[in-house]
């Protein structure tokens, strides 16, 4: 917590090809060691592959995948009287998007394909069809929140 007032959130610029801020966030999350060109190439190649594979607009597939991966609830550890409870909380829209992108890339990274753009395209395709590891992660998170519903009154 800063002592000198509130820190303004920096807004990302929309990407040049699809004019979308979410795609920019995806590219920024793919990026390693400041190599944005490589990250853009991975992202755009994945989108190109999706276009070939599905015949649909890649942004439609991406948005469908994101909607299927973004969590509505999550659990947060809260310590009360020597016991730690997993308290279910609602996820803010900004964090929903961030978690969705993070889980999507983590799931893509664990896939068996040789190249990252194929891994990402495969995971996006799976997620848009409501299957895949990223969607499973969301379902597990929701299940955990549902199981700990009794502790919801400890919310903060």
Swiss-Prot record:
Top-level taxonomic group: Bacteria
CDD domains, alphabetized: uS7_Bacteria
Stored PROSITE patterns: RIBOSOMAL_S7
GO cellular component, one term: small ribosomal subunit
Keyword RNA-binding assigned: yes
Single annotated GO MF: tRNA binding
GO biological process: translation
InterPro entries found in the cross-reference section: Ribosomal_uS7, Ribosomal_uS7_bac/org-type, Ribosomal_uS7_CS, Ribosomal_uS7_dom, Ribosomal_uS7_dom_sf
One protein family per Pfam: Ribosomal_S7
Keywords recorded for this protein, A-Z: Ribonucleoprotein, Ribosomal protein, RNA-binding, rRNA-binding, tRNA-binding
Keyword rRNA-binding in record: yes
Family statement drawn from the similarity comment of this UniProt entry: Belongs to the universal ribosomal protein uS7 family.
PANTHER family: RIBOSOMAL PROTEIN S7 (PTHR11205)
Subunit structure: Part of the 30S ribosomal subunit. Contacts proteins S9 and S11.
Record's function text: One of the primary rRNA binding proteins, it binds directly to 16S rRNA where it nucleates assembly of the head domain of the 30S subunit. Is located at the subunit interface close to the decoding center, probably blocks exit of the E-site tRNA.
The protein's name in its UniProt record: Small ribosomal subunit protein uS7
Organism: Clostridium acetobutylicum (strain ATCC 824 / DSM 792 / JCM 1419 / IAM 19013 / LMG 5710 / NBRC 13948 / NRRL B-527 / VKM B-1787 / 2291 / W)
